[in-house]
Regions:
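Enriched for short, Lys/Arg-rich terminal
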Residues: 2-4, 13-17, 55-60, 65-95
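Generic N-terminal leader/processing signal
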Residues: 4, 27, 41, 50-52, ...
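N-terminal first-folded block
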Residues: 7-39
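Residues that form or immediately flank small-molecule/cofactor binding pockets and catalytic motifs
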Residues: 10, 49, 80
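Helix-centric, low-specificity signal for extended rod-like, repetitive segments
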Residues: 16, 22, 45-49, 54, ...
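A short, surface-exposed loop/turn module that caps and links secondary-structure elements
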Residues: 31-55
């Protein structure tokens, strides 16, 4: 089954601020995740059903939540890993 990718409004604003090359890298990885979004090594502790996509070279992270009953990958936050900013943002938005 293929999951549909949807963005939270605030995550979409962050996405649109990204350089096009970063967006393309994330889009490629999101497409791959849409087939199987449950990647054990990418699971985030403390955030229910949340996973990350890493772009190691640029230091960007994308946090998404899997909603299985609706077949949706909801992008929660996009940003730099520095000081765990993107993870803290995702945690706040999941409350």
């Amino acid at each position: 089954m293929t999951y549909i990718v949807k963005f939270r409004d605030d995550a979409l604003k962050e996405w649109l601020k990204l350089d096009k090359s970063i967006q393309q890298q994330f889009a490629k990885k999101l497409k791959k995740c849409s087939e199987n979004p449950h990647i054990p090594s990418a699971k985030l502790r403390g955030l229910k059903d949340c996973y990350k996509i890493k772009l190691r070279a640029s230091g960007f992270r994308l946090v998404y939540q899997v909603i299985d009953d609706m077949l949706i990958i909801a992008v929660v936050a996009v940003g730099k890993r520095e000081h765990s900013n993107v993870y803290n943002l995702a945690s706040e938005r999941m409350r």
